[in-house]
Every structure is written in C-alpha cells, then in structure tokens.
C-alpha cells in the first residue's frame, strides 16, 4: 500500500507540474526506506533505528565479536538499499539524532558526542565501501554543546578518512521564545 501510495503521489505531483524533489524521512523500517528510494529523490535514514529499534536495552553489553556481528547485520541490510539508491539516482541523508543512538553505540561510547560520530561514521564507511557518495549528513541534539562538539568531531574523523560530505547541524526541541531563538 505504501509503495502504490508513494508512487501515486510522485506521479500526481509531476503531472501537475511540480518538480520539487521529494524527500522521505524513514525511521524503524528499512523496508520502507527501500520503497521510498524508488520514488523519492532523497531518503533520510537514522543509524540508531535503521535495523534495530533504538534504546530497547535488551542487551546492555557487547563483546567485540558481538559488536562486529551487529555491524555486519547493518551492512547486509544496507547494501540492498544502496543498490536501489544507485539504480534510481536517489540521494541519502544519514540523520543521526542524539536521542536515538542504538544500544550498541551507547554501550560502547555512552550517550556522548563520540557515540554520535561513531554511529554516523559506521554508515559512511559502508556507503563508501559500496562506492555510493550521494550522501548528506545531519547531526541533531537538543543540547547545543553536544551538537557543536559532535559536528566538530565528525568533521575531524571524516578528514582523517578523506571524506567530504555536506553537513547539516540541527537543534531538536529548540523550544519557543527567547530560549528557542538563542538555541
């Protein structure tokens, strides 16, 4: 149903003369991301919940071997999405939210800027491995200090690995009034 609806929406907009790119923001369901990549010009995925739901706390400790197995599971699921994006010239936004880091990342790095960066870099490395570079990045946190620190760390890590991608930084839950404007 989602597939036919998205296809119909895309076709209807194009038939009406609209050429604004469609962007899908997908959480918790990699299958939906696959379908969205067929009809949207850009799909946002969240590393914290792309394969597994974020913060389930079902597993609190990961050995190095278990950590590597989880990364392999992510890669195995991400490759079909990458291929769909390549075939359809669909861009990807890797959108990392401080509030939705995976249990695996939180176990290894804590609830830190380093965890945000690790989460993003894992996905960037997979995209690079499969020669897909139509990627933009967003880093978001409700804490401006965490967000700024995360972005600076991410830029440093990307530079170390020879990566350059457009980067959006955002403050979630900015609020209203003067506090919201300052954030």
Outline where the language-model segments fall:
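Short acidic, glycine/serine/threonine-rich loops at helix termini
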Residues: 5-8, 32-38, 54-57, 97, ...
């Amino acid at each position: 149903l989602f597939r036919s609806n998205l296809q119909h929406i895309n076709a209807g907009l194009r038939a009406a003369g609209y050429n604004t790119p469609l962007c899908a923001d997908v959480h918790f369901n990699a299958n939906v991301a696959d379908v969205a990549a067929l009809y949207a010009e850009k799909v946002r995925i969240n590393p914290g919940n792309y394969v597994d739901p974020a913060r389930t706390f079902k597993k609190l400790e990961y050995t190095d071997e278990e950590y590597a197995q989880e990364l392999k599971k992510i890669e195995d699921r991400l490759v079909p999405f990458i291929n769909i994006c390549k075939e359809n010239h669909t861009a990807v936004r890797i959108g990392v939210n401080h509030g939705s880091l995976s249990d695996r990342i939180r176990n290894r790095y804590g609830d830190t800027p380093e965890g945000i960066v690790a989460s993003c870099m894992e996905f960037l490395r997979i995209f690079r491995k499969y020669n897909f570079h139509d990627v933009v990045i967003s880093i978001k946190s409700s804490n401006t200090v965490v967000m700024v620190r995360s972005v600076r760390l991410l830029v440093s890590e990307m530079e170390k690995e020879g990566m350059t991608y457009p980067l959006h930084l955002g403050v979630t839950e900015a609020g209203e009034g003067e506090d919201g404007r300052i954030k």
